[in-house]
């Protein structure tokens, strides 16, 4: 660092190649937030170490970016065992799972992300492996086929899912330690932002950290990403420190508002508000209109909007709340949405025209009326 750059970000900081990995805490005591989950895990880990046994199987449930993978890695470190990682969609056939399980040593941790996307046939093989530490495989085909039992080391399966409802009951019941992770508070995220800035050797003020934290959607991963983008702006502006003004300017340029809503969130809310007069509207129609997969909407967009009280899920579909109308700066219609069908665009799917094109055309016509 040059002497005349001591108080500047410009040229003084090089961010790591993999910032997410470098910022992850290594022990439970360094992990911020999720106090109940952390306290319980500490007890379970200590008990397993005292008994010299493998920890019971663990299932983490919660939206993306809350620390499921990080906690799994910390567990392996605290237990003093090896950590193996994979994801549900990657395990395509029985041989893939057998290779993973037979290479595990005593008390090792195997982490399977997105376990709700595991092939049902593979899931059947996993049952005896979790319960009896045995692998039941069929060798050969036809009349020559035979069943082979392979003994496995006593391991710990740690799985993560964003969709608990998609797990079958037999699989869900085999996890002795289910843990739900919740969105973080602004205070917790502010602490995380300050810690990450310190690791980056980037000076940041209290109000700057608070500004980033309150727009991070309750998610540490998003807080880390926003901090890196704010660092970019501060670098170019040659700011001495990241304060509220720098953070606000950067995040406004990124179209992240003061509650953390991004353009996709606002498009979601505007679609229901403007096209469907506040709802109710079905999730499939929303997915088609936004050109986004249904899973992405249910896993990424809706959890935060539900937590913030912007939308409600009803048997007839999604509706937006008074809070959402106010946030969008719009007035809620006085007539019920159900009786306002005449002003809703014709979204019949019998036409060859995609639903999303019809909705975009409707919004364009309203803009230029």
UniProtKB/Swiss-Prot annotation:
Record-level Gene Ontology MF annotations: ATP binding; ATP hydrolysis activity; four-way junction DNA binding; four-way junction helicase activity
Protein name in the entry: Holliday junction branch migration complex subunit RuvB
Chain intervals for the UniProt region annotation (Large ATPase domain (RuvB-L)): 1-184
Entry comment, domain topic: Has 3 domains, the large (RuvB-L) and small ATPase (RuvB-S) domains and the C-terminal head (RuvB-H) domain. The head domain binds DNA, while the ATPase domains jointly bind ATP, ADP or are empty depending on the state of the subunit in the translocation cycle. During a single DNA translocation step the structure of each domain remains the same, but their relative positions change.
Region of interest (Small ATPAse domain (RuvB-S)), residue spans: 185-255
EC number from the UniProt entry: 3.6.4.-
Cited SMART domains: AAA
Gene3D superfamilies in UniProt: 1.10.8.60, P-loop containing nucleotide triphosphate hydrolases, Winged helix-like DNA-binding domain superfamily/Winged helix DNA-binding domain
Sequence positions that bind ATP: 23-24, 65, 68-70, 131-133, 174, 184, 221
Similarity annotation: Belongs to the RuvB family.
Chief site of localization: cytoplasm
Enzyme class: hydrolase
Protein's UniProt keywords contain Hydrolase: yes
NCBIfam families xref list: PRK00080.1, ruvB
Reaction(s) catalysed by this chain's protein: ATP + H2O = ADP + phosphate + H(+)
Coiled coil: none
UniProt region (Disordered), positions on chain: 1-21
Compartment(s): Cytoplasm
Alphabetically ordered keywords of this record: ATP-binding, Cytoplasm, DNA damage, DNA recombination, DNA repair, DNA-binding, Hydrolase, Nucleotide-binding
GO cellular component term of the entry, any: cytoplasm
Function (record text): The RuvA-RuvB-RuvC complex processes Holliday junction (HJ) DNA during genetic recombination and DNA repair, while the RuvA-RuvB complex plays an important role in the rescue of blocked DNA replication forks via replication fork reversal (RFR). RuvA specifically binds to HJ cruciform DNA, conferring on it an open structure. The RuvB hexamer acts as an ATP-dependent pump, pulling dsDNA into and through the RuvAB complex. RuvB forms 2 homohexamers on either side of HJ DNA bound by 1 or 2 RuvA tetramers; 4 subunits per hexamer contact DNA at a time.
Region (Head domain (RuvB-H)): 258-369
A Pfam match: RuvB_N
Binding residue positions for DNA: 294, 313, 318
